[in-house]
């Protein structure tokens, strides 16, 4: 894959990135919001006057409060789930206890998904399982090899494609994610049906 393909953006990403940046800055508030320069300019206002007005405008963070109130309401009563035949399964219990392989349980991860969806209007959730050379299910259980969740915010998922299976269903066959970017480098992951 060449540099041009890696820099390509999905048309929906291009259409929404300014909104997503506004939403997260509104949620974070403070200097993040001020630095977005979202105040409307007055018709005859000079750039210096506008900068001074932005600098002296108080930024009360009501967006964060609203998201947190809704989140606390939704998660006040823990969800109940029916796992059917999987109830009590070792790998399921391990997943529920550490859903993201960073020590956070499933409810905590899903609470973050809900908060991101409240901020951005959507978010991406990837469920993956490490590739291994184990030969049996018992070996996987012994090594705690199991699925895990990764949460991606929409500004980091820059390109994707859905294909139609022979059954008629759509499935994701291509995904480009920016994991980290700074002045010196960018870490970009490309997911296809064949490889990551």
Set out the residue ranges of the language-model regions.
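Extended, helix-rich architectural segments
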Residues: 1-160, 164-166
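Intrinsic disorder/low-complexity signal
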Residues: 81-84, 172, 178, 192-193
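Short, hydrophobic/aromatic-rich segments at coil-to-beta transitions
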Residues: 109-111, 169-176
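Structured loops at beta-to-helix junctions and adjacent beta-edge loops in soluble globular domains
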Residues: 128, 178-180
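Helix-boundary and N-terminal cytosolic regulatory elements
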Residues: 164-167, 171, 181-183
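Long, internal scaffold/assembly segments composed of regular secondary structure
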Residues: 185-196
